[in-house]
């Protein structure tokens, strides 16, 4: 008869389990939001796999509180008090209060009887919705109250409790049944036989009706319902990031829940706790600041990228050899004079030929430009006695801003790169003029002859002259990373191997791991960093030598400055589309219409930013990819397509940094802001005016192209060049009048 009743109770419990299965899923979803421990998540997986075959008991308890309180929370608030007064505990419930050794002494006898008692706990866990359920004070429970609990539990197991009778959860407050929490010491003194549990959801392993599966489930419940010390060991992996309450030692991952808990648990200790927390944070910030200052090194471009190596110091044998030029049959006394003579021959031939190429080739670096105007701009901005911070001394090219120079150095050159080599003594330098000066001073009165195009050394006059003249032909191979040009592809390939780090900068030796090196184009960029607009903070770049241990303050500041700009991998070195508008600050005479961009400008800017983001987020993992603009392999999309750049002198736009650099150097090598200095000097030396003899059209030296177009459109017109001697007074008055009209 007992077996039939137990089987009937089991069937009723299975039906209620099917009804509440959806609510059970909701319970576990909320448990996941509360960041369960790893051992709890593992039990949840086993429940989801075996919920069709086995019965599962899920209850939610708090730290050092009895687990039986969940069983009594299955009814409505009215029925719960009634059940305590009129009934006694179920024998199965009383077995839970026993130690684990007594609870599983005879598993086969109580396996089926204990099944209905698990169902109310399941209901209570569903009604709690992941919140901590309050615990009952069992010191006030009389033996008369214990007599009716069995009838209450059995009658509830045969009825379906509607969802309206289930206790609604209260977020953040533990007030179920309006009872008070007992402290840890009280629970241990009143219920000495109850097992201690941790502040998390404890679960009893599934148990079936067979006696063979009951014992393993008991063993698993002993592991879960263990003492506080065991549970603390299980949660040890995340204990480093947890903060505990100073009174009850309950641990929290976030600070706000801990504050709410301390307001209820120990309100008198919260102020002291917050002061201690602030002092710890301030110490940590100060330590991080000092560490970041120690782990930061600021270097200039000249110190980081440029270098010089003396080579083998051996005095070459002086032979006062004469050299004869077979073109003009002139005899030169030594090798240096013969080299200068060949250079003059080249200039004379260019003047006699009067070809277009002779007027578009730079006499210093032998680069060719589309027109004479761009050649003049290149000479005045690059080959000057003034040492500007926007000139790359390796390539001998000038850039518009310091940021463009830094981007060029990052993409093209290596630290301590010395591609210019003396083939006689292996003297190396990052600057071409250093090698040329070294050769003229150290190897004078020898048989060695230096080619100014490829630095090849010859020892005979005739082969040297033939080699010299072959460089004037079109079939030459230029190095894209320096000014050298070669006659064969093999020589160019061998030279490319020299574009590497030859000698590591001395400042980088012996640095601790994690040190960040900040490269600046000039010393002035660091001083104007705080007062200048955000675009002026761009000209500093950081090179991370190893994995950083702590984030430096410089990186944090630069990330804050560039927060409103396009997202890049290195925000300190990549130009943005908002750099030019930010260059003009309020107070420089700009009107409101200029300060506020129009709808069309905003739309174009949004479109450019969208293109930049799409290119940077592009990821292709299979095979190698080549950029169709610069014809180079793409290693990283985000750094290769850093931002959308527009040319100020033509309609050229691109997202490729290398393509834009090549465009500026070959097509639009225009003068920068410092070109105004040279215009003043040239105006002081000479005043040249072009006058059309048929009409009133006039043009100065800056309008040579306009005069050429004028004469081309009007075939019958002719012009005359008028050269005036401009005095210093005229230049001063002219500059003063320009200042008045501006």
Swiss-Prot record:
It is found in: Nucleus. It comes from Mus musculus. A zinc finger (C2H2-type) spans 323-345, 360-383, 390-413, 420-443, 477-499. Signal peptide: none annotated. InterPro entries: DUF4195, Snail/Krueppel_Znf, Znf_C2H2_sf, Znf_C2H2_type. There is a cross-link at residues 10, 23, 42, 65, 85, 123, 135, 180, 186, 193, 580 (Glycyl lysine isopeptide (Lys-Gly) (interchain with G-Cter in SUMO2)). Its main location: nucleus. GO terms for molecular function: DNA binding; zinc ion binding. The keyword Repressor does not apply. Residues 138-243, 523-608 are annotated as: Disordered. Residues 138-168, 182-191, 223-243, 579-592 have a biased composition (Polar residues). GO terms for cellular component: nucleus. This is Zinc finger protein 280C. May function as a transcription factor. Pfam families: DUF4195, zf-C2H2_Z280C_D, zf-POGZ. Keywords: DNA-binding, Isopeptide bond, Metal-binding, Nucleus, Repeat, Transcription, Transcription regulation, Ubl conjugation, Zinc, Zinc-finger. Residues 200-222, 523-578 have a biased composition (Low complexity). Residues 593-608 have a biased composition (Basic residues).
